[in-house]
C-alpha cells in the first residue's frame, strides 16, 4: 500500500460546499473524497493506492488535474484499487462537478451508485447522510492488502419519501459486490435501531449484495443475524420495512435471507433473490444439477418475475428510478400501520409455504410450474414480454 501527499498553492477560489464522495474503491476503480481544507490558501491531495511503484504516473495525473482545476482550499483524498489514469481523471472530474453542483439524479437505477440511488429516489433535498464526515472502513481488508472504502460500501441516513419520514440504507454494488462485513453490517443494524428509537414510520433497504463478505465471513454472519433480530423488533414496533431489489447483484446469501424478513419487496426483471447462487450450486453439485451458464434458467429460478409470480415479493416495476420511487410510495400506502409481526401473520405465511410446496410437485423451475399450472401465462412467454405486458398478464399492476 503506497501513500502520496501533494500540496499546492493555486490561484482560484471555489465556493465552500459540504463533503462529497464519488466513485467506488472496487477493483479497477477508486473513491474520491472532496471537502473544504482547513487552510483556504492551499489544496492538499492524498493518494492511497494498493498498486506500488507508480509514483511518476500519479505525479503526472495530479499535475494535469490541478491545471484543469486550479482551485485552492480543497482537501482531496483518493482511495485507489488499481484504476487506470483515464479512470482516475474521470473520477476526479466527476468529483469536482459533484462538489460544485451536488449529486446528480439518475434515470437508470442499475447504473446509479449507492448515493445517486438515494438522491434520485427520495424527496428533493431531504436526505441527511449519517457518518458522512466519519471514516468507517473495514478493519480487516488492510491486513489482506485490499483497498478500503471510507463508508465500507453502505450509505445510511434519513430522508422523506412523499413527505413521509424514513430511514434508508443503500448498498454500494461495486464495492466487493455489496458484501456485508463487520462495519457494513453494523451500520445497517445501527440505522434500524435508530428508526426504532425515533419511531420513524418506515425503513427502506436498497439491497444490492451477494451476501456476507468472504474476507470477514464470521463477523459478517454475526451481523446478518443481528440485523434480522433488529428487523423483527422493527416490525413488532409497527415500523414498515421495505426492500428494493432492482440491482445487478440481487439479494443473495445473508441478504437474501434478510429480504425474506421484510414486509414488502419490490423487484424488476433483472432482480434475483436466493441464498446459494447458481455458480455456487454448480461448483458443489456439478453442471448436471445446475448449469450456471444457462442465463434464462437462472432467471426462471431466482429472477424478479419468478419471485413476483410466486408471491415472494409484493411489487414489480421497471429499471427506471421514477418507477421505483412510485413503487415505494405504493408500498408505503399499502402497508398497514399496525404491527405486522404476530402469530396470525406467521401462521398465514406457513400456510402459503405449504400450498407452494404442494403445488410444486416435481417442477424444478418456474417455467415448468407455469406449464403445468398456469398455461395461459406459459403460452404468452411471460418471461420475455415487456414490463407493461407482464403486469397486464399477471393482473397485478399498480
Task: Give short role names for the model-derived ranges.
Residues 161-172, 186-213:
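A structural preference for short, pocket-lining loop segments at secondary-structure junctions
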Residues 210-341:
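Conserved catalytic cores of soluble enzyme domains
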Residues 145-162:
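N-terminal short beta-loop-beta anion/metal-coordinating cradle
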Residues 15-17, 22-31, 44-47, 51, ...:
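Conserved mixed alpha/beta catalytic, RNA-binding, or beta-rich assembly cores of soluble enzyme
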Residues 1-103:
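N-terminal intrinsically disordered, cationic/polar leader segments
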Residues 11-17, 134-144:
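Short Pro/Gly-enriched beta-strand edge/turn motifs at strand-loop
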Amino acid at each position: 500500500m503506497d501513500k502520496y501527499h501533494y500540496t499546492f498553492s493555486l490561484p482560484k477560489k471555489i465556493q465552500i460546499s459540504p463533503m462529497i464522495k464519488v466513485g467506488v474503491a472496487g477493483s479497477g476503480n477508486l473513491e474520491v473524497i472532496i471537502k473544504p481544507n482547513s487552510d483556504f490558501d492551499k489544496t492538499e491531495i492524498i493518494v492511497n493506492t494498493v498498486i506500488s511503484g507508480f509514483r511518476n504516473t500519479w505525479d503526472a495525473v495530479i499535475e494535469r488535474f490541478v491545471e484543469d482545476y486550479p482551485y485552492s482550499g480543497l482537501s482531496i483524498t483518493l482511495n485507489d484499487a488499481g484504476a487506470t489514469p483515464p479512470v482516475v481523471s474521470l473520477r476526479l472530474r466527476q468529483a469536482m462537478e459533484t462538489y460544485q453542483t451536488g449529486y446528480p439524479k439518475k434515470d437508470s437505477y442499475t447504473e446509479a451508485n449507492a448515493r445517486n440511488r438515494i438522491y434520485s429516489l427520495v424527496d428533493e433535498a431531504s436526505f441527511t447522510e449519517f457518518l458522512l464526515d466519519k471514516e468507517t472502513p473495514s478493519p480487516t481488508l488492510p491486513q489482506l492488502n485490499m483497498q478500503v472504502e471510507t463508508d465500507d460500501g453502505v450509505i445510511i441516513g434519513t430522508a422523506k419519501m412523499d413527505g413521509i419520514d424514513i430511514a434508508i440504507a443503500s448498498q454500494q454494488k461495486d464495492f466487493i459486490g455489496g458484501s456485508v462485513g463487520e462495519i457494513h453490517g453494523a451500520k445497517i443494524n445501527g440505522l434500524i435501531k435508530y428508526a426504532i428509537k425515533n419511531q420513524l414510520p418506515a425503513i427502506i433497504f436498497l439491497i444490492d449484495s451477494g451476501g456476507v463478505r468472504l474476507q470477514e465471513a464470521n463477523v459478517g454472519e454475526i451481523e446478518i443475524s443481528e440485523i434480522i433480530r433488529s428487523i423483527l423488533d422493527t416490525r413488532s414496533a409497527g415500523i414498515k420495512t421495505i426492500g428494493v431489489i432492482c440491482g445487478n447483484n440481487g439479494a443473495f446469501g445473508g441478504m437474501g435471507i434478510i429480504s425474506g424478513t421484510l414486509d414488502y419487496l419490490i423487484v424488476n426483471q433483472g432482480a434475483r433473490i436466493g441464498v446459494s447462487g447458481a455458480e455456487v450450486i454448480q461448483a458443489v453439485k456439478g453442471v448436471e444439477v445446475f448449469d450456471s451458464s444457462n442465463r434464462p434458467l437462472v432467471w426462471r429460478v431466482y429472477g424478479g418475475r419468478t419471485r413476483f409470480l410466486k408471491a415472494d415479493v409484493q411489487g414489480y416495476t421497471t429499471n427506471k428510478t421514477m418507477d421505483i420511487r412510485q413503487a415505494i410510495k405504493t408500498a408505503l400506502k399499502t402497508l398497514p400501520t399496525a404491527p405486522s409481526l404476530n402469530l396470525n401473520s406467521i401462521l398465514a405465511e406457513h400456510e402459503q409455504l405449504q400450498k407452494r410446496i404442494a403445488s410444486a410437485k416435481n417442477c424444478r423451475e418456474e417455467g415448468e410450474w407455469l406449464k403445468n399450472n398456469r398455461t395461459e401465462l406459459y403460452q404468452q412467454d411471460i418471461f420475455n414480454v415487456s414490463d407493461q405486458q407482464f403486469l397486464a398478464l399477471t393482473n397485478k399492476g399498480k
